[in-house]
Amino acid sequence: MSTALRIVVAGAGGRMGHAVISALRNRNDAVLHAALEAPGNASLGKDAGMMAGGAPLNVPVTQDALAAVVRADAIIDFTTPASSVALAALAAQARIVHVIGSTGFAAADEEKIKAAARHAVIVKSGNFSLGVNALMMLVREAARMLPAYDAEIVETHHAQKADAPSGTALMIARAIAEGRKLTPEDV
């Protein structure tokens, strides 16, 4: 019998962090190993399970990323570009998996993540939803089939949305560009 994967949730106090912690709660193949938040975050010191709206998990939210990755198998990260870049470097040093759902990366950040990926498995997406990824396939094909049509991306978000354009909007722009064999800047 295999042991459960030990998961670090970075951005534990956010909406996606809560969702990941809740999803891990009743799994036999994965457990919450550590919960990370930024220095000064109101969630620090709280039990991650209770913070996510459930029973205690006896995993306090911490800001100590280095201690969190010790003996971890993977990091699931919904934080900020700066935090994701730092976590990618730690994942590379520890040779663990790093799943990045953060968005808003500068080109220099992307290069640092690519460098870290030489030593760690890194999975990065602006949106992990099955529906959105199916939409990307459809957008790519429509852009290829309808080159004479203009493409426009319009989005609306909740008031707490941290980045604009969103990772999903950028994914749509890349899908249009791929369908038309252009660069995203030319779309």
Where is each model-derived feature located?
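Active-site-lining helix/loop region of Rossmann-like oxidoreductase modules
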Residues: 2-28, 41, 56, 143-187
